[in-house]
């Protein structure tokens, strides 16, 4: 289903035993080989030894590393310097200060999340001022609030997982529906910008 609808990214949770979606580095290498070349593979890590994301980025298995632990600036810069590949750093947003901390990150992209994971509840979007740097939005985003999330915060990308599942497994029907919906929203947003320019 993923290859059929071609989302921009496909995320793989790597060596995170606490996640039910956990995969080994070897499993990811196999899955990525079957991924359409237009889809960028992203490895999701939580406080991994830096050698793990570095090796998968260097061998071409991954386009980017998405970090969800307590990785500091030194860790982020080490991955960037040793691979030349993008780093996405996730931040739990509970206060305006959390947003400012995220904006100061040396990561190539920041990911704004509600932080507790899997609750299906978004964080308070009013905490996010207009953001100039490209960011990913995650946490509690699904069919019912996707349009509002994009029109309110204008993220560069949205990170979806639980909302694409049925009984804990990725649902091909939901994946198709949400990608179609995202493409419609993006077309509408582009149309609005064109009209604003013409006025």
Predicted regions and their residues:
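Conserved N-terminal beta1-alpha1 strand-loop-helix module at the mouth
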Residues: 1-199
């Amino acid at each position: 289903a993923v290859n059929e609808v071609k989302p921009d990214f496909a995320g793989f949770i790597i060596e995170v035993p606490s996640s039910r979606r956990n995969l080994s580095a070897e499993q990811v290498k196999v899955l990525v080989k079957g991924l359409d070349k237009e889809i960028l593979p992203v490895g999701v890590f939580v406080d991994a030894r830096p050698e793990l994301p570095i090796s998968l980025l260097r061998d071409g298995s991954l386009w980017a590393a998405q970090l969800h632990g307590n990785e500091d600036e030194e860790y982020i810069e080490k991955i960037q310097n040793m691979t030349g590949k993008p780093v996405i750093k996730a931040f739990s947003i509970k206060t305006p200060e959390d947003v400012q901390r995220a904006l100061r990150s040396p990561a190539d992209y920041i990911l704004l999340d509600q932080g507790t994971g899997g609750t299906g509840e978004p964080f308070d979007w009013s905490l996010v001022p207009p953001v100039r740097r490209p960011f990913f939005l995650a946490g509690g985003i699904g069919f019912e609030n996707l349009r509002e999330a994009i029109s309110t915060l204008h993220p560069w990308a949205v990170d979806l997982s639980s909302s694409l599942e049925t009984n804990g497994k990725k649902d091909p029907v939901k994946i198709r529906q949400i990608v179609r919906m995202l493409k419609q929203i993006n077309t509408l947003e582009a149309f609005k910008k064109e009209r604003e320019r013409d006025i």
